[in-house]
UniProtKB/Swiss-Prot annotation:
Cited SUPFAM superfamilies: Thymidylate synthase/dCMP hydroxymethylase
GO cellular component, one term: cytosol
Keyword terms: Cytoplasm, Methyltransferase, Nucleotide biosynthesis, Transferase
Keyword Transferase included in the entry's annotation: yes
Short name of one Pfam family: Thymidylat_synt
Keyword Chaperone applies: no
Matching PANTHER family: THYMIDYLATE SYNTHASE, THYMIDYLATE SYNTHASE 1
Catalytic activity, reaction form: dUMP + (6R)-5,10-methylene-5,6,7,8-tetrahydrofolate = 7,8-dihydrofolate + dTMP
Name assigned to this protein: Thymidylate synthase
Function noted in UniProt: Catalyzes the reductive methylation of 2'-deoxyuridine-5'-monophosphate (dUMP) to 2'-deoxythymidine-5'-monophosphate (dTMP) while utilizing 5,10-methylenetetrahydrofolate (mTHF) as the methyl donor and reductant in the reaction, yielding dihydrofolate (DHF) as a by-product. This enzymatic reaction provides an intracellular de novo source of dTMP, an essential precursor for DNA biosynthesis.
Native source species: Alkalilimnicola ehrlichii (strain ATCC BAA-1101 / DSM 17681 / MLHE-1)
Oligomeric form and interacting partners: Homodimer.
Length: 264
């Protein structure tokens, strides 16, 4: 994960000071890309410990099309608590848009199911896209999507995925996003009888919050460790049938965690 540390160092030393919605302040750069060859290990940050349970359960929650944090709370995941309303709801965020995008004539489009079908039937298509950025429903979302659009690409029997992320909280959020979409790529590859290829991350506003700078400096002093390997239950052939126990990361070596406040 040297590429991640390189981005962090670049923003730390060359980022432009900017104000932001939360009132915290950031150092920011605009436009950056990282590529991860999934055959060389699973791209999870090793220079601090990540809460893998949260990453896995959040992705399964997205895939279910849910927008209420009850499932997350039941599984010990609190990363969405600050944005939920008194009933635990977040509005039509990621999972709703992925699985139930509303159309003008009142229908609902399951973008993920459509992409899975097209990957199997038309792998060379250039239309394997899923978007969470529904302009008409942004006002009803607890938080507009930071990771907004992803596209799959098939070549020589390998599935790659590129994510466009409009806003990237480098210290806290980005390690989760990279691991989550790398996991999704592995899962989609398995159910489509493909091998994992690359995960390409493209960021818009890439920033470090000013109250994360000390933590970033500490992390930048640490040496990356070897990447772990992802193991999926090979019997799962339906993307929406994966459960937590079907997913395992083997050999995850990491440095100690580094705590930092969330900007809300």
């Amino acid at each position: 994960m040297q590429a991640y540390l390189d981005l962090m160092a670049h923003v730390r030393h060359h980022g432009t000071p900017k104000s932001d919605r939360t009132g915290t302040g950031t150092l920011s750069v605009f436009g950056h890309q990282m590529r991860f060859d999934l055959s060389r290990g699973f791209p999870v940050v090793t220079t601090k410990k990540l809460h893998l349970r949260s990453i896995i359960h959040e992705l399964l929650w997205f895939l279910s099309g849910d927008s209420n944090i009850a499932y997350l709370k039941a599984n010990g995941v609190s990363i969405w608590d600050e944005w939920a309303d008194e009933n635990g709801d977040l509005g039509p965020i990621y999972g709703v848009q992925w699985r139930s995008w509303p159309t003008p004539d009142g229908r609902r489009v399951d973008q993920l199911a459509q992409v899975l079908r097209d990957l199997r039937e038309h792998p060379d298509s250039r239309r394997h896209l899923v978007s969470a950025w529904n302009v008409g429903e942004l006002p009803n979302m607890a938080l507009p999507p930071c990771h907004t659009l992803f596209q799959f690409y098939v070549a020589e029997g390998r599935l790659s995925c590129q994510l466009y992320q409009r806003s990237a909280d480098i210290f806290l959020g980005l390690p989760f996003n990279i691991a989550s979409y790398a996991l999704l790529t592995h899962m989609v590859a398995q159910v489509c009888d493909l091998k994992p290829g690359e995960f390409i991350w493209t960021g818009g506003d890439c920033h470090l919050y000013t109250n994360h700078l000390e933590q970033a400096d500490r992390q930048l002093q640490r040496e990356p460790l070897p990447l772990p390997r992802l193991r999926l239950n090979p019997e799962v052939r339906d993307l929406f049938a994966f459960r937590y126990e079907d997913i395992a990361l083997e050999g995850y070596q990491h440095h100690p965690p580094i705590k930092a406040p969330v900007a809300v």
